Amino acid sequence: MAAPWWRAAFSVTGRCRGISTSASLSRRTPPLGPMPNEDIDVSNLERLEKYRSFERYRRRAEQEAHAPHWWRTYREYFLKETDPKDRINIGLPPPRVSRTQKLQERKRFLQELRANSEEERAARLRTASIPLEAVRAEWERTCGPYHKQRLAEYYGLYRDLFHGATFVPWVPLHVAYALGEEDLIPVYHGNEVTPTEASQAPEVTYEADKDSLWTLLFINLDGHLLEPDAEYLHWLVTNIPSNRVAEGQESCPYLPPFPARGSGFHRFAFLLFKQDKPINFSEDTRPSPCYQLAQRTFHTLDFYKKHQEAMTPAGLAFFQCRWDDSVTHTFHQLLDMREPVFEFVRPPPYHPKQKRFPHQQPLRYLDRYRDSHEPTYGIY
């Protein structure tokens, strides 16, 4: 007896699907190495060794995360990070402090704190006040320079200024813009400062020896209009005696920030270099006033290579800045040029090839492929 027509058709369709699946699986190549967790026998989970503590699990997870694998992560595909051990440190050496002296100082501080009954009573009653200035001074003296270095690496300052070379800013650099007669806008390490607030030269302070010489540099890393790998020099003060910036030689007068409209946030950095001796900066001197952007084109790496035998980077402070109304005044009145305006053109959204019979698709599926913006929803 012949089989029904629908049964024969089903058998043919099943065979065709099986052939197609087998053909697609045959094109798959085996992995280049063991897959994650392939060495774990999951047939009997109760017999597996338990961690029994979160700390033991954390150590094992960190060990596996840092172990070399045959595959690459998303970050390794797009970011070519160098080993921190291979980076060149161009900064000052760390201050030498005796380990015994540090332990004795901590022990003495704890003994004084325990002997103070008023501090103990205030802490118990939750009325104790913490001197934030003393906390910040202690932070800048101990772990603050390393935190600043990590922030600078996060914002890509070392990568774009020194092509990967790094340094620890051991000298605390304090920069503040005057806003009125009493208010100050501080520059920390990545905070936002508007061009209006930075229209005048800031107040720069740092601790220095009496007979030392310094160089202060203020640049814009992202604002060059013609060269993508160049910076704009906004301020350069050289041969500064001790911490008296006003008595230094102003090799380049101060120019307010002018991030172009539509270009987003720009990174502005203050770099402090310690000089070993007086340096002749005649080749780096700009005329005063200097309102030609071609004369303010600057390469920090070339500047450092030229004088690296006599100066060392020691301090760092930077902020982010974006366009406001004062930038228009800077372009028109100071730079005497038309203001450039940028606009980000988003790429068109990707849509797969339209199907003639979109099975199990909503009615608004057709809106993706219509030339007009008139929706189909509510028409039919």
UniProtKB/Swiss-Prot annotation:
Record keywords: Coiled coil, Mitochondrion, Ribonucleoprotein, Ribosomal protein, Transit peptide
Pfam families on file: PBP (PF01161)
SUPFAM superfamilies: PEBP-like
Subcellular location: Mitochondrion
InterPro entries cross-referenced by the UniProt entry: PEBP (IPR008914), PEBP-like_sf (IPR036610), PEBP_euk (IPR035810)
GO CC annotations, alphabetized: mitochondrial large ribosomal subunit; mitochondrion
Cell cycle in keyword set: no
Coiled-coil residue windows: 98-123
Record's keyword annotation contains Mitochondrion: yes
Transit peptide location: 1-26
Family: Belongs to the phosphatidylethanolamine-binding protein family. Mitochondrion-specific ribosomal protein mL38 subfamily.
Subunit structure: Component of the mitochondrial ribosome large subunit (39S) which comprises a 16S rRNA and about 50 distinct proteins.
Official protein name in the record: Large ribosomal subunit protein mL38
The gene coding this protein: Mrpl38
